[in-house]
A protein has these predicted regions:
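C-terminal end-helix/capping segment
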Residues: 82-96
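Short S/T/G/P-rich N-terminal loop/turn motif that feeds into the first structured element of a domain
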Residues: 1-54, 58-70, 74, 93-96
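Electropositive, surface-exposed helix/loop patches at the edges of structured domains
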Residues: 68-86
């Protein structure tokens, strides 16, 4: 069953975040991830959405998504994400 990671990101140091972005695709592809949406200015329909970037990504399984998140390669670039942004993310199951 496909799963989706939905992330909200507030970038506060573009230089650090760009280092994260530069290594992201290479690591992401190793785990069969698929980028569905990256939006710097999403339309808020309900509630507060103070973050500047919204991201939706797909993985073929929860196992694949968690393997990506915990991999050494991803953790090596995630330090730049953490230094350059404040992020919140959730993993949700797709409908089958």
């Amino acid at each position: 069953m496909s799963v989706y990671i939905i992330a909200r990101v507030k970038i506060h140091d573009r230089n650090e975040y760009d280092k994260y972005s530069a290594g992201f695709s290479v690591v992401f592809k190793k785990f069969d991830g698929k980028m569905l949406s990256v939006d710097e200015d999403p339309t808020v329909l309900m509630g507060n959405w103070d973050d500047t970037r919204s991201v939706i990504i797909e993985f073929p399984s929860k196992k694949s998504a968690l393997a990506w998140m915990t991999s050494e390669d991803y953790q090596a670039i995630a330090k730049h994400r953490d230094a350059g942004s404040t992020a919140h993310s959730i993993l949700v199951n797709g409908l089958e």
